[in-house]
Each structure stands twice: as C-alpha cells, then as structure tokens.
Amino acid sequence: MLHAQPNWSGGIDFSHLTPVDLVDYQDTVLKRYRKYALERHFRSYNFNLSRRDALQLTNLFYRVRGMQGEFYMPTWTEDFIAYTGVSLSSPVLVADSTIQGILEDWEDAAVTFILKNGEIFTRKIAAVDPYIEGSDAFNSGYDEGFDAQIPGTERVAITLTSGLGRNVSRREITMVSFTPLSRFASDTLSVNWVHHNLASIKINVQSVDKT
C-alpha cells in the first residue's frame, strides 16, 4: 500500500483508456466490445518526501517495478462524493461515484478515506450496489440528509470488507478516493535530492487490468 501524498501544488496528471476488442463474426460484421467495465487509469505524481519516506518509496519501486509486483495506491482525487458516514456496525458508504463501470467491475479494488483530522483509512471493497432511495438497508445514525445526486454520477452503496475502527460521520470526511490495484508504468524512477532530508520524486502509475 502506497499512502504517500503527492505534492498538491504540482497537480496530478490523469488519463483514462477503455480497452476494446474487435470481433469478426464472419458475416462481414465487425463489432467492438469493452474488455473491462472499468477504464484503465494512468497517473503521474510528483512527491516531496522526507528521507525516510523517499527511501520507502524507492525500495517499493525496485521491488515491484515492471511486472514484478502490484500495490494499492489511491488516486488522490474525489472519486466518491460521500453522502453517509461509515458506522462501526455497518461498514457501508453511500456516495455518488464518478468511476465509470464501478457497479460491474469492483473486484480487487479498494477505497481510501482522508479525514479532516489527517487520518487515512484504506479498505477493500466487498460489494458495490445501486443505492435505492428510501431503503432502510443503509440507514444509520451517521446518515445525514441526502443532497440531490450530482449529474453524471452513479449513486452507489459501497460495502467495505471491514469498518474504520470507529463511527465516522460524513462531516469528518474530506475526500474518498478510488484505490485500484496498480503497478509502476515505467521502469525509470526520477529522484532529485534537493536537500539531505528532502527528495523530489516523480512516478508513473497504471491500474492493473483484471484478467
């Protein structure tokens, strides 16, 4: 799990790719279909890290670069706009999702909660279901009145594999980020030691296609 936060002033470069297959049905009709419901994510991040954190990142890179291994890393973008908190007894988050295809292809993915007090929690996804307005299944003391659904999003109920260790209300949440299984997209790591205890590092990451 890579929890290092990027240099926010440098921005995040983000692109999507939707893989498709071309099928010949031998009747002169060619059709394309999506191989995966989820789009593939390509991301570039710039980090300003302490010596300890920089060494942890470089050690991870050399251990898993290329096809040697995979890791979880949040997108560090607001992919799920939370409309409930997460209760200790019911680890379910209701949110408007900007992730296309999340209802059909959520296996091996996780979500990361960034709280206003600085706490960060990552939990794997156990299930994603359409949210049914008025359903009692997701009501708890940590639900606060729903706003209108944001255009272009899907309102979903995300069941987590475990809770966050305590009740977390919506008001405590700064951001909820999609956290796909990822690998480094390049075998080259750019590291610039600007100080004996500060390194500027750029990495390129891509989400892993489910096969």
Across the structure, where does each feature detected by a protein language model lie?
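Extracellular/virion structural assembly segments
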Residues: 1-211
